[in-house]
Swiss-Prot record:
Transmembrane segments: none annotated. This is Oil body-associated protein 2A. It comes from the Eukaryota. Pfam families: DUF1264. Residues 22-31 have a biased composition (Low complexity). Belongs to the OBAP family.
Length: 252
């Protein structure tokens, strides 16, 4: 299955498959024994990598092969250093949110060091930040401002592993490359998605846009091969194909 497949055939892993309409993954309710085990493990284990997520950012993403397909995303951000961040991406901020992918975020310095072929997979963040689409829910504007100035000059590579927008109840098929919203009409986020997000958090994207007029955008918003589709009108999709395994002699 390619990441560009529009809709898998009905299965128990898709909405309506198995006779239900829920978008929750198929499976039995968590047992009391499993809950007790989870509580005990959480008390004894450090879970250090997970606990490094210090920020929650909400924005929108578009499929690279079909920008008409758009999803609201919730990034839980870990900062490995000032030039590299890694994000677990969920479909909501609820306790039962589904992990739909991962995004890596790098500074312009790191982006410029990448070969052209690799740069094609990365997108810029300047427009979605200045337009008010990117927000840190419940974070005061003054505290958010310094981070926005920094993030406006960064680049991301986002792989979506669970296409929940088409009703998949499980992660199906190959991962899909995602791109960021842009000023180009072909990459404008649907107003209904923005309105739904704004109503939930009690904010206004239009007001955020006005408040961010002084956010410093990079002089060159699409350097190198960033936002490849904007210039070439071609996206990227992943196909899974059989391949000969490398064979190694057994150890003596």
């Amino acid at each position: 299955m390619a990441s560009s497949d529009g809709k898998p055939l009905p299965t128990p892993a898709s909405v309506g498959g198995g006779g239900g309409s829920s978008t929750a993954p198929p499976g039995q309710p968590t047992t009391v024994a499993s809950k007790v085990l989870d509580m005990g493990a959480a008390a004894m284990q450090s879970l250090r990598p997970v606990k490094q997520a210090k920020q929650h950012m909400c924005t929108f993403a578009l499929y690279a092969h079909d920008p008409k397909r758009q999803v609201e995303t919730h990034h839980y951000v870990s900062r490995l250093n000032q030039d590299f961040l890694q994000c677990a991406v969920y479909d909501s901020d609820k306790a039962d949110a589904r992990l739909i992918g991962v995004e890596y975020i790098v500074s312009r310095k790191i982006f410029d060091s990448l070969p052209a072929e690799e740069q094609r997979l990365w997108h810029s963040h300047a427009h979605e930040i200045k337009s008010g689409l990117w927000t840190s829910p419940h974070v005061a504007g003054l505290l958010e401002k310094a981070e926005l100035d920094h993030m406006a000059a960064t680049f991301g590579k986002f792989w979506c592993t669970w296409q929940v927008d088409r009703g998949d109840r499980l992660p199906l098929g190959a991962p899909a490359l995602m791109v960021s919203p842009q000023a180009d009409p072909a990459a404008a986020v649907r107003p209904d998605l923005v309105r739904k997000r704004d109503d939930r958090y009690g904010l206004s994207t239009e007001e955020l846009r006005a408040a961010r007029a002084d956010v410093e955008a990079p002089a060159e918003e699409h350097p190198g091969q960033a936002d490849y589709w904007l210039r070439h009108r071609k996206g990227f999709a992943v196909d899974v194909v059989p391949h000969e395994m490398k064979r190694h002699a057994p150890f003596p």
